[in-house]
Design a protein with these regions (language model features):
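Extracytoplasmic/secretory soluble proteins
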Residues: 1-275
Length: 275
């Protein structure tokens, strides 16, 4: 699903209920108020390369700007050119409004320091791809707590389904052993936690049997990327995460709708130059 990730402390300070904000137009007065009252928050809303305003639109990329909208009642499951849709035009107009009113960084489309701006306290919120506990996971990178609010329905798109897949290289000299390792990574909790969090006492400390705390100066570089490795249902919870996270994730996945193109992967070999 998609929605807002935002600074929990700022929302509480100004009594902002992000659950009541479902559109960019509803968000705009909040951004202006924060810009006026929080001098350090130069960019009340921000985004990285995959979290631009059109991320709230209900579509899935097929190839380049060729997309299929989830709203099949309106688009009938046809492939359309994203940049020719009225929804895309509205997203561009809204981004332009933010730019003209000084609510986003002037070089937002080329800037690469999105996380650093958030870490420096210059940003209140951004569009994000959400799941239960996502904000808590992301908060581990910062000195403040993030919260989240869902805007869209839950969709099981192809990108989410293949984004963390692991495969055996066709050039592997020992494919059977690689496959055995991948099987263990997805079934053995000890191995999964070793790969994802490192060594107990060195890279993390146990609080209880299934919860750990990670020091700020950890040298283990997978912090924040555990969702990519193995089976997330086997992993420890980190301090502050809900003990119900695993069950919430399973319920979240079960509720997800599948778009009309689910399981389809476009082979662009014949039109690679055109795309």
């Amino acid at each position: 699903s998609r929605g807002w990730t935002y600074r929990k402390d700022i929302a509480e300070k100004y009594n902002i209920n992000m659950d009541n904000i479902k559109t960019f137009d509803e968000l705009l007065p909040v951004l202006k108020m924060i810009k006026e009252n929080e001098p350090n928050m130069q960019y009340p809303i921000d985004w990285g390369s995959d979290r631009t305003p059109e991320a709230l639109m209900k579509y899935e990329e097929i190839a380049g700007t060729a997309v299929i909208f989830y709203d099949t009642d309106k688009y009938d499951g046809k492939v359309v050119n994203l940049v020719e849709t009225p929804e895309y035009l509205e997203a561009c107009k809204w981004a332009n409004k933010l730019y003209n009113e000084g609510l986003v960084k002037k070089d937002i489309m080329t800037a690469t320091d999105f996380e650093q701006r958030l870490k420096d306290g210059k940003t209140f919120c951004y569009v994000d791809f959400l799941k239960p506990g996502k904000a808590k996971e992301t908060s581990a990178k910062f000195d403040f707590e993030l919260d989240q609010s869902t805007v869209s329905d839950i969709w099981q798109d192809n990108g989410a389904g293949t984004g963390s897949m692991l495969a055996v290289s066709r050039t592997s000299k020992n494919p059977e052993r690689v496959l055995r390792f991948l099987e263990l990574l997805n079934t053995d909790a000890t191995l999964s936690n070793l790969i994802n969090y490192g060594i107990e006492g060195k890279h993390y400390t146990k609080i209880d049997d299934n919860t750990i705390t990670i020091p700020d100066d950890t040298s283990y570089t997978l912090q924040g990327y555990q969702w990519m490795q193995g089976n997330v249902f086997l992993n420890y919870l980190t301090e502050g995460e809900s003990p119900d996270k695993v069950e919430a994730l399973k319920a979240f996945n079960a509720e997800a709708k599948k778009p009309i193109d689910y399981g389809f992967k476009f082979d662009n070999t014949a039109v690679e130059a055109e795309i």
